[in-house]
């Protein structure tokens, strides 16, 4: 019986020791703000693993917002941290230079103490994680009527003399407006290669007849 009690006490002591060790190595986070760079200390990772990072000295805004942030958070418990930061940044900008001066003096004093305590300190900002690029292409927006007219006039610069050619041109505009923008350039290039020799030798009426008989193909 005594052996069981001793085993339980030993297990409880180990758990308590682990909790205390976790509390000592837990991360400390300084809240970010819109006008200055805050220093953030996390548990060791990468090159800082196993090393104690030195806190960056506070600037004037951090000294001022240290108490203001707590005050705003108590008055507005539902407000998110990002909204509090925006409000504090706006209030800081509205202060006059005379109102800001005591906080600048306090920041200079803290920086002097920091230099004496950590003479070899160098600020090393953390690199921001790059957003992952998606392989999926966004659908292209449909071109305007003016762009479609320019494309038609560029690839088919013939004169419309009869109703047949005008109908062919109208049919081409309808297909350009209803087709997907990605397939427009490919179809026009195929037609340009197919009718390049015909447009130089034949008459506009002959070209219009070919166009109406063989409409462009638009893959779905």
Curated annotation (Swiss-Prot):
Keyword Nucleotide-binding: no
Gene Ontology cellular component list: cytoplasm; nuclear speck; nucleus
Record's keyword annotation contains Ligase: no
Keywords: Activator, Calmodulin-binding, Cytoplasm, Differentiation, DNA-binding, Nucleus, Sexual differentiation, Transcription, Transcription regulation
Broad class of where this protein is predominantly found: nucleus
Any single biological process term in GO: sex differentiation
CDD domains linked: HMG-box_SoxA_SRY
Cellular compartment(s): Nucleus speckle; Cytoplasm; Nucleus
InterPro entries associated with the record: HMG_box_dom, HMG_box_dom_sf, SRY, SRY-related_HMG-box_TF-like
DNA-binding region: 54-122
Region entry Disordered, spans: 193-220
MF-aspect GO terms: calmodulin binding; DNA-binding transcription activator activity, RNA polymerase II-specific; RNA polymerase II cis-regulatory region sequence-specific DNA binding
Pfam families: HMG_box (PF00505)
Subunit structure: Interacts with CALM, EP300, HDAC3, KPNB1, ZNF208 isoform KRAB-O, PARP1, SLC9A3R2 and WT1. The interaction with EP300 modulates its DNA-binding activity. The interaction with KPNB1 is sensitive to dissociation by Ran in the GTP-bound form. Interaction with PARP1 impaired its DNA-binding activity.
Protein family (similarity comment): Belongs to the SRY family.
Role according to the record: Transcriptional regulator that controls a genetic switch in male development. It is necessary and sufficient for initiating male sex determination by directing the development of supporting cell precursors (pre-Sertoli cells) as Sertoli rather than granulosa cells. Involved in different aspects of gene regulation including promoter activation or repression. Binds to the DNA consensus sequence 5'-[AT]AACAA[AT]-3'. SRY HMG box recognizes DNA by partial intercalation in the minor groove and promotes DNA bending. Also involved in pre-mRNA splicing.
Name recorded for this polypeptide: Sex-determining region Y protein
Provenance organism: Arctocephalus australis
